[in-house]
Amino acid sequence: MSNKVKTKAMVPPINCIFNFLQQQTPVTIWLFEQIGIRIKGKIVGFDEFMNVVIDEAVEIPVNSADGKEDVEKGTPLGKILLKGDNITLITSAD
């Protein structure tokens, strides 16, 4: 019997963003110091500073009481450039 421990390889953040771009995965982006707003859309470009270009972007208000997104009140933004400094989290919207 072997005592080898299985370890998972670390995935660099840039690779994760690149996968979202390649697969055209809808994403939700949480903003730094803007807990009442999230951005949904598709990543169509990014750079080494994690600035991202989002297409079909929608600004979604978040209820401060329960943290739920109010998608019906979303504001369409179209194509936007979001600076990496403003991004707290990027996750799949699926």
UniProtKB/Swiss-Prot annotation:
The keyword Glycoprotein does not apply. It is found in: Cytoplasm; Nucleus. One of its GO terms (cellular component) is nucleus. Gene3D superfamilies: 2.30.30.100. The keyword Nucleus applies. Residues 14-94 form the Sm domain. GO terms for biological process: 7-methylguanosine cap hypermethylation; mRNA 5'-splice site recognition; mRNA splicing, via spliceosome; spliceosomal complex assembly; spliceosomal snRNP assembly; U2-type prespliceosome assembly. GO terms for molecular function: RNA binding; splicing factor binding. It comes from the Eukaryota. InterPro entries: LSM_dom_sf, Sm, Sm_dom_euk/arc, snRNP-E. Keywords: Cytoplasm, mRNA processing, mRNA splicing, Nucleus, Ribonucleoprotein, RNA-binding, Spliceosome. Pfam families: LSM (PF01423). Coiled coil: none annotated. Component of the Sm core complex, present in spliceosomal snRNP U1, U2, U4/U6 and U5. The core complex contains SMB1, SMD1, SMD2, SMD3, SME1, SMX3 and SMX2 (Sm proteins B, D1, D2, D3, E, F and G, respectively), and is probably a heptameric ring structure. SME1 specifically interacts with SMX2 and SMX3. Component of the U4/U6-U5 tri-snRNP complex composed of the U4, U6 and U5 snRNAs and at least PRP3, PRP4, PRP6, PRP8, PRP18, PRP31, PRP38, SNU13, SNU23, SNU66, SNU114, SPP381, SMB1, SMD1, SMD2, SMD3, SMX2, SMX3, LSM2, LSM3, LSM4, LSM5, LSM6, LSM7, LSM8, BRR2 and DIB1. Involved in pre-mRNA splicing. Binds and is required for the stability of snRNA U1, U2, U4 and U5 which contain a highly conserved structural motif called the Sm binding site. Involved in cap modification. Belongs to the snRNP Sm proteins family. Present with 556 molecules/cell in log phase SD medium. This is Small nuclear ribonucleoprotein E. The gene is SME1.
